Amino acid sequence: VLFVGNPGPPETRRRLTIITEGGTRTATGMWHAEELKHASCQGAVERHSWPEGDKPGLLLYSGPGVEAARAQGTLRGSYDEGKTWPWKQTYYEGGSGYSDVCVLPGGRVAVLFEQDGKSNLGFTVLPAPPPQPPGAK
């Protein structure tokens, strides 16, 4: 999954596409991720796990959790290769801008982010996300 970015106001949704063959071919057209609405801001995407058998893979996205401001840092999860983002966890309630994500041993997730402005960095480690989407059996 490639995050094409956000063209800026008035559009607030991230655009995504699938790239295959080592990055040489676009496998799909672009689509908007309805759940990833936010003020124009760099976010981070990281693969937490690959699909295996009947178990879905998990993509993570970190960015502002609100549409109107760089605030409420939120980690989101997609279990269908970026089509939907049903799982989310807020990691910081205040000002939260650019971020990066890293999957740690055991599945926990580290997030480094701009905290309360561009002069401060925040860092947090979150528990491993659920292996299945919310409501799955």
Q: At which residue positions do the language-model features occur?
A:
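Asp-box/BNR beta-propeller blade signature and adjacent active/binding-site loops
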Residues: V1-K137
